[in-house]
């Protein structure tokens, strides 16, 4: 033995060693083979088979080995393979002093015994944190390895049970360990009691040296011959104050079939020493007396990253394409977890340590960390890169680009084997308070590395691969597309000349197919889209690849994913053009936009080809003009509403026409489709090739990442924006900004109210329907929903409309401050926030009395009404007398925008409006909710604290008497019930009682301790009776129709104020014009009558043209049908055109009278209103159409009197300003609002006093009463003027208030607008004789000249001869043809001249004798579909006789006249 060897070991004399056992000594003495352990054993077995006979009994077959024998016999179970193995692994290159990843040939078992000693040294740092050094010496030449640490030494004392020193017990006896107590949680590497003993067993010499400072002793002992021989321990006095433990061993190379420690093994052993630099904190590591310069785990990791960079075949780009390729993301999470991340070179790498053990095969700890990082990376990238869609990438593909470094401490770790290469401990058993969590900080730092580019590249490649599966090609035939009508030339060499028509559904496809009969099937194909195309910009590749519509389009057109198309290679497609054929509405625009988005995103270049994308337009309106003469009818199509409106206001005034709206393609007939395709150039429009900012606008419209920019884009939208219908080539940016934006706005329009009336369109439609129906008596909500849906063009389902109606009628606390509809039934309560309403078929509603005080009917003619198909529906907005958006508040969520506006006290609003009128500064207002008794406290400029009410009523009882507004009773109850506790929580409420009526009252009992706790916390806070109210999101459509965010409530008031004031001026101007027109008309009628009476004007025996010329000669003013003076005769039909129009009207009058039988009316075909032009004759209808009873002196005087009255009204109106009119409305509103509040308070007090809600009274049927006996006719005496009309049969409800009725209440105002107004040129008044059952029709009269009294006269006149009327009515109803024969010779239009001739009293006005008696009652039994109604001219003088009442004819037939015998 060399001198160097004597430094490590004893002299080897026989006195120094004793055999550990006889059996092992003999065994080892006889086996001196230099073969590897495995080979030696196998050769022994094989030789025994050849030379030794087989055992003859079972005892010889079955053997028992000692533990030591078993380890030597089967080493792979304990230390791994003892054969040389080629493997790729990280090593330390001593020459370059760097890590390298290379293929080496090592014996894993030899590496493992060295590792066991290193782990023991590292474990001692856990036991003794004061340890400072670990020194490793590897003498390859002499085959000697030494590991020393200066931590606490091994106790040098005798083991009481085993009767040997503890160092000998630990290193020389198997299955000895300090780690067997599983109740004690340790984070060391030792586990099974083998460890260093394995190193001893596989060494020819093994020595331990340890210093125990406590005992003051130094202990030395050695083993030889594979731990078979052990020397006696040498114990001496410790001469230093330093403790240490040193292990020196000589590996038994023969057991590993090795002659020496080769370079491959040495490089792995050196790397393992470097591992300690990263895993053992605050400890100096020495290798062969050289201190290693790595002092942290991050520094250790950098060695690997540097090696990765050197291995990379491509240099790191300098242009930023791949960011921070060699960046290390390192983070220490706690004292047990330290993780570093780097980007790998395409395969997953990990270097991990569990309690300083190198887990080269990973394990549960590596999976635990990597899974978290991968999931968070994919999730975050999905949000950042592609919106909310999931990236098409597998976790393993992400893992392949990761290099993870993990240094962790696991309590009592478990491994797959004694080699400890792979951890198997469950995550739940890792121990420690805090485990590793991939937090946002770590993920965000990882996202700054090049892994983002790698993941994106992999995901894109996967997506492309998936999408390419559905690629099309130029085939002559496509299989599996049942709905495809393929062009005959598609897929051939002429395919690029073919056009594919994409239609909106199958119904539109029928229209296209009908058109193909004109252009042929060779170059035109057709395919229907089912619904709306997928937004591919935000969709995942998985969604796109599974979308049937997109796959069909790719196959039909022949599109290939990501192929860049040009004008040259477009011939590779089956179709060279796409024509979009959708409805001309917002949904149609959306479909066009989605197709553009699909092509721009998936097939770059297609939109750069001029003429590739086309659209087919159809008319929105068709006008049928009745041409005169032999020309017949003429049809004029209009493709935009502005175009139609211009024609209507110009050329349309000169002719008779009807209009038909084409809402969708399905409205057109196959014949019309052929007409469209015949004039294909007129109906085709091209989309301009991409230019300028087109791509940016497409991205703006469809990308979720552009949400903020889209919000600003929508905010800049101006109502009335539309594409120019004259352009033949549509720029895509214009399409997005002027057509597609209408669809984008539609959701906001439905969800966000107007600042002017506070309504959304659905609410506005309901109110319009109620006004149109004159809803003064209750109706079922279900019926009202049906009526509104039918009459206002509502297209979203009646159930949604039902909820809107219920919302307008709800009046519980927190709902509406003013409910414009009455809640007659269960409309929901505060308990559930109104969601607990009854079914619509069980509840009733009607207009509240206050509603028309808010929405004055005098404003109705001033609104701009929406056109929906042939219907005129609700106005664009109403103008209430005060801003209802602040009265009832508003909530809604739209696209990119939402709103939340609180409610305010109407009286405060009125005060501020009047302050604005007076030029005073506005006062700040506090939100107010009717009936709510809580507290509101400011918490800043735009926030309020909302508090309920709670009081302590005894030592352990509290009473809740109010809850925060918008917090519902059931929510509070649920919270209180949770206070009773459950299996997981302790109770803190003893008992709870409810005593609610219309108010809130909870009585809650607590324990003494909980009461004290509640008082410390605060009763409001403990019982969650505090919320907040924000003013920071008050969004509404401003008066210009643009979305606007209001900064404060006063800004809303100002926006409302100026528009409302402007419309009061418009109301005054409108009323002034009407009064002036009425004055002029009355004056002209009086002059006409006077000239007839004084025989200055003769109308007898003159033709129409002569009469008109005569009137023009006397400068009589011409009036239109709506009562407005006609300034120029150029606006009228004259000459032959006028004669032909008059003849047409007379003929239609005859047809109408002859076709009034119910049997002749065709069901399902509503009469279409035709526009009838004004003629020179109709302009004098107000004179020549007067009934002959008007030509009396009494009537002349009455008209003069009425003229004076109207003049007085006009002067009174002119004396008032717009503000005066507004103040008058506000006074009336406040008076009604006080009544409204009083009724509400009385109802609540009544319900509270009864302790429960009263049952709803049943709606009484109209039954006979004392004043109105059943089944009896009521005869009204002619001279009595108790009412202006017969009492109608009405349903009555019990009420403390007198019921208003048209028959009993006097007019509150002069009906100024009832005279020839444009919106209602004549107002209908319906009167009905009393009695429950009557066969008489309702008598319809048209109010003119404030004729309340004369209506009564006419009714009395009819009533006085009711018997004759009924008989005549019955006969006319039974025999309409016979009655027609009794008509005068001019049944179409009766002039004064004709009437005088019929009555044979021409020139005699003193004693008129009618030719036959006709009554209004008789005339009403026969339906006449005429446009003009008879007009009653009467006087307001109550002392006039009814004989003076005269009915002015409309000139349509004789039935208009009412005379007395």
Curated annotation (Swiss-Prot):
Protein name per UniProt: DNA topoisomerase 2
PANTHER family: DNA TOPOISOMERASE 2, DNA TOPOISOMERASE/GYRASE
Ranges annotated as biased composition (Low complexity): 41-52
Localisation per UniProt entry: Nucleus
GO CC aspect terms: DNA replication termination region; synaptonemal complex
Binding residue positions for ATP: 120, 149, 177-179, 190-197, 418-420
Function, as annotated: Control of topological states of DNA by transient breakage and subsequent rejoining of DNA strands. Topoisomerase II makes double-strand breaks.
Gene3D superfamilies from the UniProt entry: 3.30.1360.40, 3.30.1490.30, 3.30.230.10, 3.40.50.670, Histidine kinase-like ATPase, C-terminal domain (3.30.565.10), Topoisomerase II, domain 5 (3.90.199.10), Topoisomerase, domain 3 (1.10.268.10)
Binding positions for Mg(2+) 1 per the UniProt entry: 504, 583
Gene: TOP2
Region annotation (Interaction with DNA) ranges: 382-389, 1024-1033
Bias kind Basic and acidic residues: ranges: 1274-1283, 1406-1417
Sorted UniProt keywords: ATP-binding, DNA-binding, Isomerase, Magnesium, Metal-binding, Nucleotide-binding, Nucleus, Phosphoprotein, Topoisomerase
UniProt family annotation: Belongs to the type II topoisomerase family.
GO BP annotations listed: chromatin remodeling at centromere; DNA strand elongation involved in DNA replication; DNA topological change; regulation of mitotic recombination; replication fork progression beyond termination site; resolution of meiotic recombination intermediates; rRNA transcription; sister chromatid segregation
Reaction equation(s) it catalyzes: ATP-dependent breakage, passage and rejoining of double-stranded DNA
Domain Toprim residues, every copy: 498-614
Active-site residues (renumbered): 842 (o-(5'-phospho-dna)-tyrosine intermediate)
UniProt site positions, description: Interaction with DNA: 532, 535, 710-711, 760, 794, 800, 968
Site (Transition state stabilizer): 841
Location of region: Disordered: 1-61, 1122-1155, 1244-1461
Domain Topo IIA-type catalytic: 752-1226
Binding site for Mg(2+) 2: 583, 585
Subunit and interaction comment: Homodimer.
Gene Ontology MF term list: ATP binding; DNA binding; DNA topoisomerase type II (double strand cut, ATP-hydrolyzing) activity; identical protein binding; metal ion binding
Residue stretches of biased makeup (Basic residues): 1251-1261
């Amino acid at each position: 033995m060399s001198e160097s060897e004597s430094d490590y070991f004893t002299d080897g004399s026989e006195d120094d060693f004793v055999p550990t056992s006889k059996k092992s000594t003999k065994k080892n003495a006889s086996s001196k083979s230099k073969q590897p352990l495995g080979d030696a054993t196998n050769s022994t077995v094989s030789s025994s088979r050849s030379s030794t006979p087989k055992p003859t009994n079972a005892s010889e077959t079955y053997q028992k080995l000692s533990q030591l024998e078993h380890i030597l016999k089967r080493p792979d179970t304990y230390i791994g393979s003892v054969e040389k193995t080629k493997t790729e692994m990280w090593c330390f290159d001593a020459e370059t002093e760097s890590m390298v990843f290379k293929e080496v040939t090592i014996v894993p078992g030899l590496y493992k015994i060295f590792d066991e000693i290193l782990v023991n040294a590292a474990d001692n740092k856990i036991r003794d944190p004061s340890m400072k050094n670990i020194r490793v010496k590897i003498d390859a030449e002499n085959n000697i390895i030494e590991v020393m640490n200066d931590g606490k030494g091994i106790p040098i004392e005798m083991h009481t049970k085993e009767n040997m020193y503890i160092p000998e017990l630990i290193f020389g006896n198997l299955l000895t360990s300090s780690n067997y107590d599983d109740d004690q949680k340790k984070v060391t590497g030792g586990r099974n009691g083998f460890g260093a003993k394995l190193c001893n067993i596989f060494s020819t010499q093994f020595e331990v040296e340890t210093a125990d400072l406590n005992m003051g002793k130094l202990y030395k002992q050695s083993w030889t011959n594979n731990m078979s021989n052990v020397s006696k321990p040498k114990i001496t006095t410790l001469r230093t104050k330093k403790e240490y433990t040193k292990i020196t061993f000589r590996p038994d190379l023969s057991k590993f079939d090795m002659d020496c420690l080769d370079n491959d093994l040495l490089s792995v052993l050196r790397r393992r020493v470097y591992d300690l630099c990263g895993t053992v904190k605050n400890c100096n590591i020495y290798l062969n007396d050289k201190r290693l310069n790595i002092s942290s785990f991050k520094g250790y990791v950098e060695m690997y990253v540097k090696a990765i960079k050197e291995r990379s075949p491509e240099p790191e780009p300098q242009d930023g394409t791949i960011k921070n390729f060699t960046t290390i993301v390192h983070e220490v999470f706690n004292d047990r977890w330290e993780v570093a991340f780097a980007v790998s070179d395409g395969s997953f790498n990990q270097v991990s340590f569990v309690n300083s053990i190198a887990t080269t095969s990973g394990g549960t700890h590596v999976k635990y960390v990597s899974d978290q990082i991968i999931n968070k990376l994919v999730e975050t990238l999905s949000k950042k890169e592609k919106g909310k869609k999931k990236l098409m990438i597998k976790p393993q593909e992400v893992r392949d680009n990761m290099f993870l470094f993990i240094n962790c401490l696991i309590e009592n770790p478990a491994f797959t084997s004694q080699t400890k290469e792979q951890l198997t401990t469950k995550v739940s058993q890792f121990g420690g308070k805090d485990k590793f969590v991939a937090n946002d900080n770590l993920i965000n730092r990882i996202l700054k590395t090049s892994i983002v580019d790698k993941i994106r590249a992999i995901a894109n490649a996967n997506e492309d691969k998936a999408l390419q599966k559905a690629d099309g090609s130029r085939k002559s035939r496509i299989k599996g597309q049942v709905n495809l009508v393929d062009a005959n030339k598609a897929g051939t060499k002429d395919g690029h000349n073919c056009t594919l028509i994409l239609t909106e559904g199958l119904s539109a496809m029928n229209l296209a197919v009908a058109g193909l009969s004109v252009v042929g099937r060779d170059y035109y194909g057709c395919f229907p889209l089912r619904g709306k195309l997928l937004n591919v910009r935000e969709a995942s590749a998985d969604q796109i690849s599974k979308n049937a519509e997109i796959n069909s389009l790719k196959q039909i057109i022949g599109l290939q994913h990501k192929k860049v198309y040009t004008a040259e290679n477009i011939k590779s497609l089956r179709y060279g053009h796409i024509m979009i054929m959708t409805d001309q509405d917002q949904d149609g625009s959306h479909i066009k936009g989605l197709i553009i988005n699909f092509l721009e995103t998936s097939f770059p270049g297609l939109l750069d080809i001029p003429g590739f994308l086309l659209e087919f337009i159809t008319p929105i309106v068709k006008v049928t003009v009745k041409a005169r003469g032999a020309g017949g009818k003429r049809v004029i199509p209009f493709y935009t509403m502005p175009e139609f409106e211009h024609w209507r206001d110009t050329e349309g005034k000169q002719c008779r026409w009807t209009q038909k709206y084409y809402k969708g393609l399905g409205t057109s007939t196959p014949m019309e489709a052929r007409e469209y395709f015949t004039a294909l150039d007129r109906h085709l429009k091209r989309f301009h090739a991409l230019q300028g900012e087109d791509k940016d606008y497409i991205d703006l419209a469809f990308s979720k990442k552009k949400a903020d920019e889209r919000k600003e884009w929508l905010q800049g939208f101006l109502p009335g924006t539309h594409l120019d219908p004259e352009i033949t080539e549509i720029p895509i940016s214009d399409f997005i900004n002027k057509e597609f934006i209408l669809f984008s706005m539609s959701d906001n329009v439905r969800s966000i109210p107007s600042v002017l009336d506070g309504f959304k369109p659905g609410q506005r439609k309901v109110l319009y329907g109620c006004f149109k129906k004159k809803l003064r008596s209750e109706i079922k909500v279900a019926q009202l929903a049906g009526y509104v849906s039918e009459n206002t063009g509502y297209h979203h389902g009646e159930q949604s409309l039902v909820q809107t109606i219920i919302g307008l009628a709800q009046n519980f606390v927190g709902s509406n401050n003013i409910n414009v509809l009455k809640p007659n039934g269960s409309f929901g309560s505060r308990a559930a926030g109104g969601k607990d309403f009854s079914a619509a078929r069980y509840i009733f509603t009607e207009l509240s009395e206050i509603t028309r005080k808010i929405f004055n009917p005098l404003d109705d003619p001033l609104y701009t009404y929406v056109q929906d198909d042939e219907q005129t529906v609700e106005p664009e907005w109403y103008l209430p007398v005060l801003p209802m958006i602040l009265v009832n508040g508003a909530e809604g969520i739209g696209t990119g925008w939402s709103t939340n506006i609180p409610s305010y006290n109407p009286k405060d609003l009125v005060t501020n409006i009047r302050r604005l009128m007076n030029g005073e500064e506005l006062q700040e207002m506090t939100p107010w909710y009717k009936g709510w008794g809580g507290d509101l406290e400011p918490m800043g400029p735009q926030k309020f604290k909302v508090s309920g009410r709670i009081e302590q009523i005894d030592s352990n009882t509290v009473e809740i008497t109010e809850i925060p507004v918008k917090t519902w009773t059931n929510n509070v109850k649920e919270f209180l019930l949770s206070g009773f506790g459950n299996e997981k929580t302790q109770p803190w409420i003893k008992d709870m009682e409810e005593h609610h009526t219309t108010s809130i009252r909870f009585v809650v009992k607590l324990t003494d301790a909980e009461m004290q706790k509640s008082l410390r916390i605060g009763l409001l806070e403990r019982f969650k009776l505090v919320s907040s109210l924000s003013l920071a999101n008050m969004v509404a459509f401003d008066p210009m129709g643009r979305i606007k965010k209001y900064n404060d409530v006063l800004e809303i008031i100002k926006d409302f104020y100026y528009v409302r004031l402007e419309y009061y001026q418009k109301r005054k101007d409108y009323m002034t014009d009407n009064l002036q027109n009425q004055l002029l008309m009355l004056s002209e009628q009086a002059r006409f009558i006077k000239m007839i009476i004084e025989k200055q004007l003769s109308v007898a025996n003159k033709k129409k043209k002569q009469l008109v010329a005569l009137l023009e000669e006397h400068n009589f003013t011409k009036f239109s049908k709506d009562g407005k003076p006609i300034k120029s005769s150029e606006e009228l039909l004259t000459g032959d055109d006028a004669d032909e129009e008059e003849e047409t009207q007379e003929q239609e009058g005859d047809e109408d009278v002859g076709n009034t039988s119910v049997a002749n009316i065709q069901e399902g075909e509503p009469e279409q209103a035709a526009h009838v032009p004004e003629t020179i004759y109709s302009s004098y209808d107000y004179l020549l159409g007067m009934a002959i009873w008007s030509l009396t002196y009494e009537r002349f005087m009455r008209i003069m009197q009425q003229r004076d009255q109207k003049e007085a009204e006009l002067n009174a109106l002119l004396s008032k300003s717009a503000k005066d009119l507004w103040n008058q409305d506000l006074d009336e509103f406040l008076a009604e609002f006080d009544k409204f509040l009083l009724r509400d308070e009385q109802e609540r007090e009544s319900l509270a006093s009864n302790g429960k809600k009263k049952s709803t009274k049943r709606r009484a049927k109209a039954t006979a009463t004392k004043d109105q006996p059943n089944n009896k006719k009521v005869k009204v005496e002619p001279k009595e003027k108790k009412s202006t009309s017969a009492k109608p049969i009405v349903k009555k409800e019990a009420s403390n208030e007198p019921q208003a009725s048209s028959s009993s209440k006097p007019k509150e105002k002069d009906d100024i607008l009832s005279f020839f107004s444009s919106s209602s040129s004549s107002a209908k008044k319906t009167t009905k004789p009393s009695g429950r059952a009557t066969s008489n029709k309702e008598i319809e009269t048209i109010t003119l000249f404030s004729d309340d009294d004369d209506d009564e006269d006419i009714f009395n006149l009819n009533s006085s001869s009711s018997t004759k009327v009924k008989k005549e009515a019955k006969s006319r109803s039974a025999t309409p043809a016979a009655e027609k024969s009794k008509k005068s010779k001019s049944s179409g239009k009766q002039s004064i001249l004709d009437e005088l001739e019929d009555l044979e009293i021409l020139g005699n006005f003193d004693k008129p004798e009618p030719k036959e008696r006709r009554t209004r009652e008789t005339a009403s039994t026969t339906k006449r579909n005429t446009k003009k109604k008879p007009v009653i001219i009467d006087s307001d003088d109550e002392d006039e006789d009814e004989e003076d009442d005269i009915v002015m004819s409309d000139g349509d037939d004789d039935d208009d006249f009412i005379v007395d015998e």
